[in-house]
A protein has these predicted regions:
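PLP-dependent aminotransferase class I/II
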Residues: 40, 201-279, 284-286
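PLP-dependent aminotransferase-like
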Residues: 94-152
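PLP-dependent enzyme catalytic core of the Aspartate aminotransferase-like
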Residues: 311-312, 317, 321-349
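N-terminal "arm"/small-domain region of PLP-dependent enzymes with the aminotransferase-like
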Residues: 1-54
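Active-site phosphate-binding strand-loop segment of PLP-dependent enzymes
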Residues: 130-186
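Conserved PLP-binding catalytic core of the aspartate aminotransferase-like
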Residues: 266-267, 280-312, 328
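Phosphate-binding glycine-rich loop
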Residues: 56, 60-101, 299
Length: 349
């Protein structure tokens, strides 16, 4: 057996509370880009009475039809997954053989490299510029005959910047499969899905975890060419979207206006945090189009800042032993959480 470095997710609130010596109800989770408002009551109500004793539809017909209306793409260009993570894994299974190459651009979402390691692929991470933009010469220079797929997030997690269309086109023109992860699309309002008509090697990945507040139900989806989606449908687990997840997505799409109002509120809280940080000495941030900010601390280490926030019950995301070891990613919260965060920041910087 081969030892694979584990991808570590976030701890539950009970574990965070134990580490901080506080009550679980006092934990403020700003470490996973979760939606602090949770699911709409109407979405939760939609789960009641579902036929949980039955297997879900392996063809995902209701789900894909509703998604088709939402994204403006034909049903045969859409597939649902048990979170975006499953679709990343399916793309690896479909395109990558052991020893072949997967390309990403660090710093970015760690699931791409984790899935590549599981596929026994070689992962190449091209460096970004000092403003976290894609370095196209570095990216294209890393592509060779063994390169099978490129993963780029837009907005990028954790830096928050967008993938420019001209950069996406430059990579797509190489002929290599490009997966653009638009998990935070509802916060940025920016998409490259209009390029799908021009490039059959483009895949758009999205999620309901962040904007819809149902991360615990694990539902994501991909948009691509009809041929590519057909192949993904062929290799997925037959019942990968559970009954509860499907019901929640259908209800979320029906009541999307209310959910999008919540996303706008979270963007406003991010902007409020930006304004406060602008006036703080010793901390700066990188402009973000997501529901989070990547903050850099100058007068103390990121570990010290993390510990200081944790003493206030606020948990954020660390990146030790990476190029971001001096930074923390802070998720947008409710107005009350933002106020507590600002108070804590002013006490630790």
């Amino acid at each position: 057996m081969v030892k694979i470095a584990t991808y570590h997710g976030v701890d539950p609130s009970e574990e965070l509370a134990r580490k901080a010596g506080i009550r679980p109800e006092d934990v403020i989770r700003l470490n996973a880009n979760e939606n602090p408002y949770g699911a709409l009551d109407k979405v939760s109500a939609a789960l009641v009475g579902q036929p949980l004793h039955l297997y879900p539809d392996p063809k995902q017909q209701k789900l894909r039809t509703a998604l088709s209306e939402y994204v403006g793409q034909p049903v045969d260009r859409i597939i649902g997954g048990a979170g975006g993570d499953e679709i990343i894994d399916l793309l690896m299974r479909l395109f990558v053989e052991p020893g072949q190459t997967v390309l990403d651009c660090e710093p970015t979402f760690g699931m791409y490299s984790f899935a590549a390691r599981l596929a026994d692929a070689k992962i190449i991470s091209a460096p970004r510029t000092n403003t976290w933009d894609i370095d196209i010469p570095a990216m294209t220079g890393a592509i060779d005959r063994l390169t099978r797929i490129i993963f780029l997030a837009s907005p990028n997690n954790p830096t928050g910047n967008l993938l420019r269309e001209r950069d996406a086109r430059a990579l797509l023109d190489t002929g290599v499969i490009l997966c653009v992860d638009e998990t935070y699309y509802e916060f940025s309002g920016n998409t490259l899905s209009h390029l799908l008509d021009d490039y059959e090697n483009l895949v758009i990945l999205r999620s309901f975890s962040k904007w819809a507040g149902i991360a615990g139900l694990r539902v994501g989806y991909a948009i691509g060419s009809a041929t590519l989606i057909s192949h993904l449908m062929d290799i997925k687990q037959p019942y990968n979207i559970n009954i509860a997840g499907e019901a929640a997505v259908l209800a979320a799409l029906e009541h999307r206006d209310e959910l999008l109002e919540r996303t706008r509120s979270l963007v406003e809280q991010r902007k409020k945090l930006e304004a406060v940080i602008n006036d703080l000495d010793g901390v700066s941030y990188f402009p973000s189009q997501g529901n989070f900010l990547l903050c850099k601390f100058e007068h103390r280490t990121a570990e010290q800042a993390f510990t200081g926030l944790a003493r206030h019950g606020i948990f954020v995301r660390q990146f030790p032993q990476t190029v971001l070891n001096d930074s923390l990613r802070i998720s947008a919260g409710t107005p009350e959480q933002t106020d507590q965060l600002i108070y804590a920041l002013k006490n630790i910087v």
